[in-house]
Swiss-Prot record:
Catalytic activity: 2-N,3-O-bis[(3R)-3-hydroxytetradecanoyl]-alpha-D-glucosaminyl 1-phosphate + UDP-2-N,3-O-bis[(3R)-3-hydroxytetradecanoyl]-alpha-D-glucosamine = lipid A disaccharide (E. coli) + UDP + H(+); a lipid X + a UDP-2-N,3-O-bis[(3R)-3-hydroxyacyl]-alpha-D-glucosamine = a lipid A disaccharide + UDP + H(+)
Cited HAMAP family: LpxB
Gene: lpxB
GO cellular component terms, A-Z: membrane
Family, similarity comment: Belongs to the LpxB family.
Keyword terms, alphabetized: Glycosyltransferase, Lipid A biosynthesis, Lipid biosynthesis, Lipid metabolism, Transferase
Name assigned to this protein: Lipid-A-disaccharide synthase
């Protein structure tokens, strides 16, 4: 008699963040079903957990329209090949991790062949291009969402969605150790500290750094002992920031860090940052913040017409109100930014209330996401 086939899960991750999620999911599934088989497109972390890589994740990690066009034939070939091979393999469940432009079409192809599909990490359909929700609904049996308002959005369109909490909320403590973070960064315990995070993309750093530095200069008038830390994602961004600083504030002392954004947030009394995942991380670090963002005028005009939400930062979207100041475009200028940061650095009622709300929101999205994702995969496999 033939051996029963082990549970087989196909996965496709297209970037580093997806590799981290995939590895966590595989680990949680292996703890319950040790002989489960995992195949697909995987990064080094997923492969270390035992995922058999038919293609390396780097093949899909392409940024920018020009780069995508240059690699389009190869990407279409990979998607067609995966459609065929997964169709022959008949996995119990297919999990597309993020990379929506690649994965949602692949999920649709597989669902048509009777393979159960999950899309892990909702694209920002609630914010813009909302009609994508119908394509997602046709392509997937289930969406796994990090944030509760994402589930509420899918529910409106009767697209099956499960809120599993956010892996970053699981990874970060409810009460971070500010003193230990300062020790790691060499910041004295008895001074005020401001973190500047002008973004991870070159265009953001170019657009925001000068105003962020001028803001810190204004705050130093009120707080002469203010320490300023600037975590930068890589050597390229550091070089870029150093050039802008030399032009804008050559005499100003700032501590530039290679990475270490999380420590910088935990160590600081307040942060000024570009929007994006950094705002969520800053909330989880319990660091009061102001979001400042500027883009090219036409891009901003277009964004205002396309974006359907009242807020741009995740803390405000989670709170359903303006919990943190969002100063965008013309409002993103040093005088206005400094005035918004002043009460946060004063360490009074405003920053205390923000800290308490951040803690409550952290608890709301801290749900053991890896385990929840594994539950969802196994439940769908049994259906």
């Amino acid at each position: 008699m033939a051996e029963p086939r082990p549970l087989t899960i196909a996965l496709v991750a297209g970037e580093t963040s997806g590799d981290i999620l995939g590895a966590g999911l595989i680990r949680a599934l292996k703890a319950r079903i040790p002989d489960a088989r995992f195949v697909g497109v995987a990064g080094p972390l997923m492969q270390a957990e035992g995922c058999e890589a038919w293609y390396e994740m780097e093949e899909l990690a392409v940024m920018g329209i020009v780069e995508v066009l240059g690699r389009l034939r190869r990407l279409l070939h990979i998607r067609a090949d995966l459609t065929r091979r997964f169709g022959e393999l008949r996995p119990d469940v297919f999990v597309g991790i993020d990379a929506p432009d690649f994965n949602i079409t692949l999920e649709g192809n597989l669902k048509k062949q009777g393979i159960k599909t999950i899309h892990y990490v909702s694209p920002s359909v609630w914010a813009w291009r909302q009609k994508r929700v119908f394509k997602i609904g046709r392509a997937t049996d289930l969406v796994l969402a990090f944030l509760p308002f994402e589930k509420a959005f899918y529910d409106k369109f009767n697209v099956p969605c499960r809120f599993i909490g956010h892996t970053m909320a699981d990874a970060m403590p409810l009460d971070p150790d500010k003193g230990a973070a300062r020790d790691r960064l060499g910041i004295p315990h008895n001074v005020r500290c401001l973190a500047l995070l002008p973004g991870s993309r070159g265009a953001e750093v170019e657009m925001l750094s000068a105003d962020f530095l001028k803001t810190a200069q204004l705050l130093r008038v009120t707080y002469p002992d203010l320490q300023v830390v600037v975590p930068l994602v890589n050597a390229k961004r550091r070089e870029q920031f150093e050039r802008i600083k030399a032009e804008t504030a050559p005499d100003m002392i700032v501590h530039m860090l290679d990475g270490q954004a999380r420590d910088a947030m935990i160590a600081s009394d307040a942060a000024l940052l570009a929007s994006g995942t950094a705002a969520l991380e800053c909330m989880l670090a319990k660091c009061p913040m102001v979001v400042g963002y500027r883009m090219k005028p036409f891009t901003f005009w277009l964004a205002k017409r396309l974006v359907k939400t009242d807020y741009v930062s995740l803390p405000n979207l989670l709170a359903g109100r303006e919990l943190v100041k969002e100063l965008l475009q013309d409002e993103c200028e040093p005088q206005v930014l400094a005035a918004a940061l002043q009460p946060l650095l004063a360490d009074g009622k405003t920053s205390h209330e923000m800290h308490e709300t951040f803690r409550a929101l952290h608890q709301q999205i801290r749900c053991n996401a890896d385990e929840q994702a594994a539950d969802a995969v196994l439940e769908l496999a049994k259906q």
